[in-house]
């Protein structure tokens, strides 16, 4: 039997997709042998799929102010932010509110 996978969906909108190769939706199969929190996911994203200007998406170990994060349509602030443990089929949406003038 193969390695267990944790399947989740990442979505990017309102300009956040521009930092990720202009891809608005990604289905991921993460290593199911480890515990995946949003903090771990952000590190993975930075290392693997963040293609443009990471300073516009990340600030330290978290998303920068102006990036909204919704997990299954719920504000991540209500779910524990970086400590939230990802579950199978979670949908994580990143929305940029940062727009030039």
From Swiss-Prot:
InterPro entries: Beta-grasp_dom_sf, Mopterin_synth/thiamin_S_b, Urm1. Pathway: tRNA modification; 5-methoxycarbonylmethyl-2-thiouridine-tRNA biosynthesis. One of its GO terms (biological process) is protein urmylation. C-terminal thiocarboxylation occurs in 2 steps, it is first acyl-adenylated (-COAMP) via the hesA/moeB/thiF part of the MOCS3 homolog, then thiocarboxylated (-COSH) via the rhodanese domain of the MOCS3 homolog. The modification 1-thioglycine is found at residue 101. It is found in: Cytoplasm. This is Ubiquitin-related modifier 1 homolog. The gene is Urm1.
């Amino acid at each position: 039997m193969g390695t267990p996978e944790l399947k989740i969906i990442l979505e990017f909108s309102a300009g956040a997709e521009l930092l990720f190769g202009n891809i608005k939706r990604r289905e991921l199969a993460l290593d199911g042998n480890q515990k995946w929190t949003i903090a771990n996911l952000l590190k993975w994203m930075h290392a693997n799929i963040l293609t443009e200007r990471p300073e516009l998406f990340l600030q330290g170990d978290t998303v920068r102010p102006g990036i909204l994060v919704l997990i299954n349509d719920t504000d991540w602030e209500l779910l524990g932010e970086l400590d939230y443990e990802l579950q199978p089929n979670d949908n994580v949406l990143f929305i940029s509110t940062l727009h030039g003038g």
